[in-house]
Amino acid sequence: MSSSPQNEAEAREKMRELMSRPPSSRPADFVNPLEKIEQLLTCPICLDRYKQPKLLPCQHTFCYPCLESCADTLHRNLKCPECRAEHNIPYDGVKAFQPNYTLTGFLEIHLQATPESAAEIEEYIHRYNLERCKICDEKADCEPCAHCDRKACKECRQTHMDMLKRDMSRLLNQVKRLANRITEASDNLSKGVDMMTMNCETTKAEIKEYFHRYQRDLKKKEDNFLMEVDTFQATETRNMSNLRDVLEIESSNMSEAVSRLDAAIKGECSIEDSELVRMKNTFTEGLEYLRNFQPDADELFNRKLRFSAGDDAAKLPAAITTSGELCVLVPQFSGRYLPLEQSYLPRPFRLPLESDSYRVKSDERASMRDREADRTSSRHSHRNPEPDESSIRYRRRQQLEDEAWNRLRNSSAAPSLLTTSVTADSSSRTSPWAADRVTRSVEPTKSRPTSLIVPNTETPRTVSPASKPPLPPQSVERVERTEDASPAPLPQLPIRKPPLPRQQSSNDDSLNEKVETIRRAHQQRQDASRAASRAVSSEESEGEDFPVSTNRGRIRIVCRAASVNRDDGLMSMIPGTGTIINVPPPQHQLPASAPITNGTSEQVAIPVTHFTGEEDESDIVVPAWLQRRRQRFQRSRTNPDIQAQFTSARVQQLLAERQSRLDSSTTTDEEKEKLAVLRQRGRSASREAGEWRARGRPRAVFGRKGAKDGELNWPRGICALSGGLVATCDSSNHRVCVFDKDGKFVRQFGGYGAGAGQLDSAAGLASSKLRVIVSDRYNHRISVFGLEGDHLFSFGGHGQGNAKFNNPWGVAVDDLGSIYVADKDNHRVQVFDKNGQFIAKFGSFGHLPGQLNSPLFIAVSRVTHHVYVSDSSNHRISVFDPHGVHLFSFGEEGFHGGQFKFPRGIAIDSQENLIIADSGNNRIQVFDAQGQFVSSFGTWGGGAGQLKGVEDVCVTADGSIVVTDRENHRIQIF
């Protein structure tokens, strides 16, 4: 760049100016190495350059003349001026001491500053005083970076600015896509003004016709009503015109900002780094404004005025003074567009920016190290650990949601006449582009007053102090289980009493003695009870004659009094040894170079945490307390005396007679058969639910956040490939990653862009024979690849017509090769043949049966050919036949079994069970083919078997369930 020589010249001039100052007036961080060398060449006695430097036996050096003056010729010794050590003078005198050849060599160097050597010396001093870049850690000319506020070298600053420009390009494209909302709202306001004028004219005609019969008596009343209508018309016209003008100003501001940024990105005009950063923040806020901009058409454009004669029309002569009223008809549910709607949506609707992620990368690493240290220290302490950032974000989201629902319930009915004002949350918020324009116009002329039209601002939202924060998912789940099991009597579990509370010392000695006596007695009783229990357990273990079988098909670990916020430790078995080791939770990832033992001694790049399956658990070491418990149960079950009594013929006969009497006295034969069928069905359903709950322990967990091979950044769609492989959409890395059944990285394909074979935030994934179908969200198309990642063809485009998409999400393929696509923002499902030719479509926006609201994922049954669609924003699953005819729906919003909160991925196993990713509730739910709830597993968290924003699910050929744990950036296999 042309400014580089100028910057170097300024740096040299600054250095010369610092060197000309005395050392005391220089900055503390400036060092002249030549002055340090000069200090080393100065004699500490005469404070001048060494003259014939002599080295004493104590390794201190002085000038020969100085040593002559310090020598004691009478006693022939010399005391070192530095360390006061006494040395004998040689026979030949002080000159016989060893010369310091090193200092002599330095003194012989001629350091005269000539015009040729001055530049080299200045360059040397300049390099010596260079700072280290805070990013690449190299010495260079560092200046504050406008992006990250850290001193960085030129290359790192340029890298940051390039990253910022890429983010600005993406923001620019999104703003252009969403800009039509303001234009449409402005056009609708113009139509609303015309419709409102027509409505008012019609109302005037009705009023005139009604009051013409009572012209003389009701003339005054008529004038009053007409005046009210005119006032209403003027007020509404003024409000709507003002709002339209505001929207037009918003549109012009946005267009100006877009054109200015577009010119800056294309290089048509120069722009400062700080201005670019400010514009990036402005566009980020503007994009948030456009996302939340959803004007209520009924509230703004369809407010109708209607004249009502009243119920006392027959008594009009007597009630002429109180007859008639004007009513403003506000459509029902006019306030259904909540301003907080976007605040508690799942994170996939908020894509992080590359520059923001890079900006806080080092801070995140430091905070992760701090959290790791906090977790380690909390394991050894008795205090509850602090809630992490994710749990705080979860509670905040729940709090915002509860607040929005309370405001919706408590909202009043239609506002009264002439006191209402047009309030639209999405329209009344101040746009960032307007603020940007005001800032630019005020900066040149600060003294000139500026009048602005400021829309209504939102009042600050307050949370009632009496409202309790929502419970974490673990505690909520426990409450549900307790409520479900409340009708049945629960066995009384032994509860360990807490220790007596420590009281503060008082000045009353007698009271302190009593308290201490009570404390000692309580401690003695506890010690005695522990000793007795240990003696009983030791006697039981010594007198045991029955072997305990440890070869169990499944191990159930019961956690007693576990803290909700604790880190779940995982158990993993070392193959061939039969010993169990504690594996840290997957969020504490191992370094990339650490070897992972998974049955073979291979070294992989990404940690893959394997868990003991159900096949080989014969060598698992059972804890002592669990072994004693099983021994007691085994002993009571195999006691020969009790066994003989209960297996005798007489006892069995009495039991059979009692059962027959009960059956004959209460039921008929048909009822007996029904009861038997119901019992068998209940036992089967209970057994099936138990088997599904037992699968909540993952077999393997792999992946972590990053962009390297095997790393993931917001994984979304997933599908099973032939050969036991699994493919997933690495959404924020704009690629598809393929892993084997053990979690080892195999290959990847795709890449960021809009060209052939490139992707922009891939979401859905499906496989058919030798092809992989990927939904390319922001390119609004479907891309078809071969199994090896070679691009075959693409189809689609942005729009609302047939074969056009608006943010396509999930894809599915049936046995005939037909491709089903969930067209999310068009609220429909489109069907294509295997070559991408349009066949049919079904679904429309709404909440009625057969309508969809942001459909996300699709699954097609291979047996019934039914199409299952996750109707996400309606919190349900909609089922269609192959022709698009709606059959039924199941599910509703909630957190109980069978209820959903933004459901996403759907998979169908070999038994036609539906496995659904309940994203908002962070769990997997299982239903039968008729939509009846079977079981669920999973909860919120970062441990094994825990989920954060589960996205998609698939079933492999061996029956394993593979889940994309989106916000944990990993894959879990159950």
From Swiss-Prot:
SMART domains: RING. GO terms for biological process: proteasome-mediated ubiquitin-dependent protein catabolic process; protein polyubiquitination; protein ubiquitination. Keywords: Metal-binding, Repeat, Zinc, Zinc-finger. NHL repeats lie at residues 699-742, 746-788, 792-835, 839-883, 887-930, 934-974. Residues 1-29, 360-395, 416-548 are annotated as: Disordered. Pfam families: NHL, zf-C3HC4. Residues 488-501 have a biased composition (Pro residues). Interacts with ubc-13. Residues 416-431, 447-465 have a biased composition (Polar residues). InterPro entries: 6-blade_b-propeller_TolB-like (IPR011042), NHL_repeat (IPR001258), TRIM-NHL_E3_ligases (IPR050952), Znf_C3HC4_RING-type (IPR018957), Znf_RING (IPR001841), Znf_RING/FYVE/PHD (IPR013083), Znf_RING_CS (IPR017907). Residues 9-19, 437-446, 511-528 have a biased composition (Basic and acidic residues). PANTHER family: E3 UBIQUITIN-PROTEIN LIGASE NHLRC1 (PTHR24104:SF47), E3 UBIQUITIN-PROTEIN LIGASE NHLRC1-RELATED (PTHR24104). This is RING finger protein nhl-1.
